[in-house]
Amino acid sequence: MNASQTKPENVILPSSNMMYPFMTLDDNAEIVHSEMGKDGRVKVYIEKPDAKDGFHRATCYLPSYTWEDIFGFSDEEINRYKKVIESTAHLIMEFSQKGGFNNAANL
């Protein structure tokens, strides 16, 4: 951020941009997550390779389940990913505080 830019009062920037692998689905979609921010939010990012578009992507923020930046996925795919995230959110939230799955599992 340079001197001419200001950060809005209500935005808390994460301390790190580190993303941790969480799960690869049977359709080759990769789910990764960030560390938990000071505001308690965790960024969950889904990405899937596509021959035409390069990658399809979507971002979900926990614990609010706010979705944004959805590109290339069908409604059916997004509904499936929503179910996956909702059913595993407790694990993602835990791992986000422990440096990802590998660190939480002492691997």
Regions found by a protein language model. Give the residues of each.
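Short, charged/polar N-terminal "headpieces" of proteins
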Residues: 1-43
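Alpha-helical membrane insertion/targeting regions
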Residues: 2-11, 19-20, 52-54, 58-62, ...
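Compositionally biased, intrinsically disordered low-complexity segments
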Residues: 14-15, 34-35, 45, 49, ...
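Alpha-helical structural elements
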Residues: 15-17, 62, 76, 90
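A short, structured beta-strand/loop element
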Residues: 31-74
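Acidic, low-complexity intrinsically disordered segments
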Residues: 71-107
